């Protein structure tokens, strides 16, 4: 699978509550110190190493290390520290490493990872000889395809399908006017980037939402560029 096939649909599968729980687990000072200790070691850490490093009882280190595993912040592995194998080698020790997967909690919702992947994909296509505008279109289409493959919509109407997908990406769609008249996207998932680089990010965002709409074969609603104000530069308008 190429990197272009790995544009993240996001960590919504974990759920907002679970991500908050993971971050909240670090509110405990001992747990937070253990996490940082493990993260800064060159290899996996044993309970004895962690206890000695923080000068705390071993049973305290064990309790908090296992809590960090339960929250998905550390991953365990088992290894015989003596280096011996076979009968008499003893039981393998439980070791701990930091997980590679990042945990993001942003309020309002931000998706800088998605913007980064679209922009990186665009640059790779340009380096391969694709013209700029075509490269942006292809990268946006690729991102939309991967998002929809990850989150196949089940809603029946065009509006419900596209707003369901955009809601999961953090756009916060809200109906405006009379029923079927349109939908405002009240949050920009790329807010800081679009504030600093509106001439780059807003066109990219518009192409991405257009691509989502095309992939969903929406005919009753279409994306339209608007003055973004405090929200998104795109709104959905009914026919």
Placement of each model-derived feature along the sequence:
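Basic, Lys/Arg-rich alpha-helical nucleic-acid-recognition elements, primarily the DNA-binding modules
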Residues: 1-98
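Short beta-turn/strand-loop junction motif enriched in small, turn-promoting residues
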Residues: 81-83, 103, 171
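A short beta-turn/loop motif at secondary-structure boundaries
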Residues: 84-88, 177, 224-229
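Conserved segment of winged-helix/HTH DNA-binding domains
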Residues: 86-126
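Short beta-strand micro-motifs in enzyme catalytic cores
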Residues: 92-96, 181, 230-234
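Short, charged/polar, Gly/Pro-enriched secondary-structure boundary elements
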Residues: 101-106, 190-194, 239
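Mid-protein regulatory/catalytic core that forms ligand/cofactor-binding pockets
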Residues: 112-117, 121-223
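Short terminal or interdomain "cap/linker" segment that borders an active site or interface and mediates
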Residues: 184, 219-239
């Amino acid at each position: 699978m190429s990197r272009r096939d790995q544009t993240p649909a996001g960590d919504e599968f974990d759920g907002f509550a679970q991500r908050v729980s993971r971050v909240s687990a670090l509110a405990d000072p001992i747990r937070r110190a253990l996490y940082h200790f493990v993260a800064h070691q060159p290899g996996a850490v044993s309970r004895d190493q962690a206890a000695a490093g923080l000068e705390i009882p071993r049973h305290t280190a064990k309790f908090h290390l296992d809590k960090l595993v339960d929250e998905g912040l550390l991953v365990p592995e088992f290894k015989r520290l003596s280096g011996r194998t076979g009968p008499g080698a003893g039981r393998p020790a439980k070791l701990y490493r930091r997980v590679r997967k990042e945990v993001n909690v942003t309020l309002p919702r931000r998706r800088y990872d998605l913007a980064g992947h679209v922009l990186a994909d665009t640059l790779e296509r340009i380096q391969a000889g694709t013209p700029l505008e075509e490269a942006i279109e292809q990268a946006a289409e690729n991102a939309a395809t991967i998002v929809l493959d990850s989150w196949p919509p089940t809603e029946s109407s065009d509006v419900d399908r596209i707003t369901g997908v955009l809601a999961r990406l953090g756009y916060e769609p809200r109906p405006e006017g009379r029923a079927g008249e349109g939908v405002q996207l009240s949050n920009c998932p790329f807010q800081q980037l679009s504030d600093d680089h509106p001439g780059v990010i807003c066109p990219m965002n518009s192409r991405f939402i257009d691509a989502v709409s095309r992939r969903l074969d929406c005919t009753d609603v279409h994306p339209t560029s608007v003055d973004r104000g405090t929200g998104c530069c795109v709104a959905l308008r009914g026919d």
